[in-house]
Amino acid sequence: MRLPACQTVVLANQKGGCGKSTTAVNLAGGLARAGYSVCLVDLDPQCNTTTNFGVDPEELHEHGKPTILDAYLKSAPASAIEVGFEDRFDGLLTLLPGHRSLDQAEASLEAKLKSRSVEEGLSPLEEDDFRHESRMRLRKSLASLQKERDFILIDTPPRLGFELTTALLAANWYLIPVFASRYDTDGLTRLTQTVRKIRQRANQTLNLLGVVLGNFDPSTTLHKQIRETLQGKFGDDFCNTVIHRSIKHAEATFAKQTIFEHAPGHQTAAQFEELTTELIAHVERTLAPAAPPEPEVAPSPTHDGPPAQAVGEVSHG
């Protein structure tokens, strides 16, 4: 590992269709190309990230193979769920596949709690403890990868619900993908409020990695205005790299490939490479130990009397 510790990054935005899965897939590919060991986690019940790598969630279910749902319902370690791709990115990229029923995980856990409460007569405090433990199961599961991976990227569903909350509790960073749309930018206030509450209550180490603008058309005045608005609102947290609109995104998804595999010479691949480099630099700057303070230089002594006698100088009275 080239980082002091594994870094977990959540891609978060409750707005659907804002490029979360596309960004997650291609950022994972970019990190792997740069030589980092990466695990990509699919928490979206649509399973777009999972299918993008040619993994069929229905087939996994039919064959009884574990998915990320098992981290919640069975407390399975992520190391037992990982799917590897030895023939892609030198084996540096792995996947925790999603499950179509992931949006029912919270309800299933609540049903289990009610059953236990009836059978064992749990107190309200014990019920609260169970709910807290349920929200921390993803974090506990991912801990099994901490010594094996440089980065863990988590793709989340388009809502402020159980899955996103558990992801933010497990993360060091959150990255906000947005499209150049008023609807995308309007929803950021609620997301930042959610993050603030999680930081205050349970995860003080959670920090904003950046806001990345995608589907950008530089010839459109509105898109330029939205870019300026985001730059003004987020300042240095707004990513310098902007991902332009391109049919190559849809083509790569259809081919079940990252943009680096599908169109390595296209400007879109170059933009995701630039974004990867920018985000790595941000993480490295943050993790770098603070420089030691400069030693204080003692002031030169001042003398009110005659100059000091030089060594070896003979005094004449």
What does each of the following model-derived ranges do?
Residues M1-G317:
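P-loop NTP-binding core
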